[in-house]
Regions:
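Extended hydrophobic/Leu-rich segments
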Residues: 8-10, 83, 196, 273, ...
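Beta-propeller folds
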Residues: 20-425, 429-430, 441-442, 452, ...
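Bacterial Sec-dependent N-terminal signal peptides
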Residues: 1-24
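Generic alpha-helical secondary structure signal
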Residues: 8, 26, 303-305, 373, ...
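Short N-terminal micro-motifs specific to bacterial/archaeal maturation
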Residues: 11, 22, 149-150, 236, ...
Length: 697
């Protein structure tokens, strides 16, 4: 009997080995972006999905279809051939696909962008009803559907083309002053430089004077003879640019600037409008980034509101506002403000009808706040509100994305504004990318998880109607010999905080062998490398290295994203120190596994991960045999003002912290082999931060 059991076991093992051998091996062409087979190994997707009110639209390559949200029934609206014939008849250019079209109105109209025009097509009559010329060099385009006015920049100045096609030059500034573009190095949630009022009657914009900022030499190699094109690069502790906010009126062609006082060493962010277009709201921050104020200004005169600031928040470390206020669509006397004041980013409802005398209140981990309006916290818990998708006016709910299910996930919730009760929208599992319909009654839910290659569904936000499936993708890597990928937790260096890790074992793993290992690291703020996503976010390179026989480990250390304020700001004034301690705990975990060759452990990362890689090689030289650091910061004194000073203060006020994070001072500690990769024209981590008087790092 025992012989029979042993024979069966051998047969099973043999068949398993044969099955694994029958599967394909990956090449770099399969796994690297841009590879010949890379896109074939991505799960199937529907790229052109969007909303036209409560009707789902699939704007694909050759045609545009409507999809009924209740039953999934499809109808063709228009074809690519029909659109290009209409454009050709008016000599308005052509399009190659429908991926860039939109449906801005309740009426059956589609907005098309060619290289030279914006075009509105009446889909009932199938005719062009309006067009607006575009400058071929227009950048930072911002179109308002109500006024049909287009704001854009040419070089460093701002222009507006109105609905009748007439162009107005808003600013005429010399080189060194930039208008209508993103400011403050894209920090504080800033992604653009123009902000239309709700009806498009007024345009708020940034004006940034950077003439006083030091030039950093960059070389344009695209010209026949290379030319010098310096960047303005404000470094930590040095002079920064000055930003003001203008309000332009296309009807009068006049501009007023907000009377916010001297802009020196101040940040202006999260610009928003009141629904009646009479007021502009701005969150203002001091250069130390530890005191934020919500202020309101008269849009016609630029004068500040008498009871400014409406809200202010301070912290002994830093405050980082990233979201503009949002008014309730059914009650314009109330707006939602986002804050981490209780330790996690949450929603707070402020009532402008109930002015109160501002009093200071204690907040989480050394913070405090003062309110001029009665405020009610809408969401609460040890999880993060990631963003607001919109509202359902009928049910009086705000639709959000949050990490309530897990720090490894992003899920949609409906939050009742009156009671604060929350309702999960859609499948509980996975990472969800969600688009809300015009009324807030439906979402397009595109989600993946470790076990779900991709599902796309139309989901009612009420939870009472049936879900309509648009796509259930199969696993395109099914035919390949995949490594085993697992996720778990280990304790941080503080002995109490759980850290998530991702472990990838080599293909055809043998527990009796000793394998080399690579730690892939980022470790900085606003980044998270592990999610309940496809392959737990493992990159193609990780999988390829596992195929070559490497154990791959990634740890999201303290200081990274989506775990709350104290998890992130424990690194304040000492970037790299606590993060490295946590990464060493990851190495200790590797060593405990029994199948890792402790003398062959490497480390690799890009950007902040490049800084971490270099730092780990120099601080713990006995742990790492080899490292590859891409685009690292070598000395934080040479990094940009906004990011660097938030986490490190200035070199003048924190000399010890900057000294400890200056990797040039510890270059002599290197024992292993370290490759450092840097772009000679890198605008973010500049080459000169490596250089010393007597040579190169």
């Amino acid at each position: 009997m025992r012989k029979l059991i042993n024979l069966i076991a051998l047969l099973i093992m043999a068949s398993s080995v044969t099955w694994a051998q029958d599967k394909k091996s990956f090449t770099l062409e399969d796994l690297m972006p841009g590879g010949n087979n890379y896109y074939n190994l991505l799960p199937q997707n529907l790229y052109g999905l969007q909303w036209w009110g409560d009707v789902c639209i699939n704007a694909d390559i050759e045609e545009v279809k409507t999809i009924h949200p209740a039953n999934g029934k499809e109808n063709v609206l228009i074809t690519l051939q029909e659109v290009n014939e209409l454009l050709a008849n008016k000599k308005l250019g052509k399009i190659n696909h429908f991926r860039n079209v939109s449906f801005p109105y309740a009426e059956k109209m589609m907005l098309v962008n060619t290289t030279s025009n914006k075009v509105l097509i009446d889909l009932t009559k199938k005719e062009i009803i309006w067009s607006q010329p575009l400058s071929p060099k227009a950048a930072n385009q911002d179109w308002n559907k109500e006024s049909r006015s287009l704001a854009y920049t040419l070089d460093n100045n701002l222009f507006v083309t109105t609905a009748d096609g007439k162009t107005q030059q808003v600013t005429d500034e010399p080189k060194g002053i930039v208008c209508g573009q993103s400011v403050h190095r894209q920090e504080f949630g800033i992604s653009k430089g123009t902000f239309w009022s709700p009806k498009g009657n007024l345009l708020a914009f940034y004006r940034m004077d950077e003439s006083m900022v030091t030039d950093y030499p960059q070389v344009n190699t695209s010209t026949r003879i290379a030319t010098l094109e310096p960047d303005k690069y404000p470094m930590a502790g040095m002079t920064s640019h000055k930003v003001t906010v203008g309000i332009y009126n296309p009807a009068t062609q006049k501009t007023v600037y907000l009377k916010a006082g001297d802009p020196t060493d101040r940040y202006f962010t999260n610009i928003s409008w009141s629904p009646d277009e009479k007021s502009v709201y701005v969150i203002e921050l001091n250069r130390d980034q530890n005191h934020a104020l919500l202020c309101c200004y008269d849009a016609e005169t630029g004068e500040p509101l008498k009871n400014n600031p409406l809200y202010e928040e301070e912290h002994t470390k830093y405050v980082e506002p990233q979201h503009p206020i949002v008014f309730l669509p059914w009650d314009h006397t109330k707006f939602i403000y986002q804050s981490q004041r209780d330790g996690y980013n949450h929603l707070y409802l402020m009532d402008t009808k109930t002015s109160i005398y501002p009093e200071s209140h204690g907040a989480a981990a050394g913070g405090s706040y003062r309110e001029s309006y009665k405020t009610r916290q809408l969401t609460q818990g040890n999880w993060v509100v990631q963003n607001i998708l919109g509202f359902n006016e009928k049910t009086k709910e705000v639709i959000i994305m949050s990490t309530e299910v897990s720090p490894l996930q992003s899920n949609a919730y409906a939050v009742n504004v009156k009671t604060g009760k929350r309702r999960l929208i859609g499948n509980k599992d996975g990472m969800h990318h969600v688009q809300l319909s015009g009324s807030g009654n439906y979402v397009i839910d595109n989600y993946t998880s470790f076990t779900i290659p991709r599902n796309i569904e139309i989901v009612p936000t009420s939870g009472k109607e049936k879900t309509v499936s648009l796509l259930t993708a199969t696993n395109p890597m099914e035919a390949y010999n995949m490594p085993e990928i697992t996720v778990g937790t280990l304790k941080a260096a503080d002995g109490k905080t759980d850290l998530y890790y991702r472990l990838i074992k080599p293909v055809n793993f043998d527990p009796n062998k000793k394998y080399p290992a690579v730690v892939y690291v980022y470790g900085g703020p606003h980044a998270q490398l592990i999610h309940n996503n496809r392959n737990y976010d493992a990159r193609g390179w990780d999988i390829y290295m596992a195929q070559l026989g490497y154990v791959m480990l990634t740890v999201d250390n303290r200081g990274s994203d989506n775990r709350g304020l104290e998890f992130e700001n424990c690194t304040f004034r000492q970037l790299g120190t606590e993060e490295m301690k946590d990464q060493v705990k990851g190495v200790d975990f590797l060593k405990s596994l029994g199948y890792v060759d402790n003398n062959r452990i490497g480390v690799h990362g890009w950007s902040f991960g490049g800084f971490m890689t270099t730092n780990l090689m120099l601080t713990y030289p006995e742990l790492f045999k080899v490292g590859v650091a891409g685009g690292p910061v070598i000395d934080w004194a040479y990094y940009e003002v906004m990011y660097g000073e938030r986490y490190m203060d200035t070199p003048q006020t924190n000399p010890e912290g900057y000294k400890n994070a200056n990797l040039k001072l510890r270059a002599g500690n290197l024992k292993g082999r370290l490759e450092v990769i840097i772009g000679a024209n890198d605008p973010t981590c500049p080459f000169f931060c490596w250089l010393e008087k007597d040579g190169v790092f």
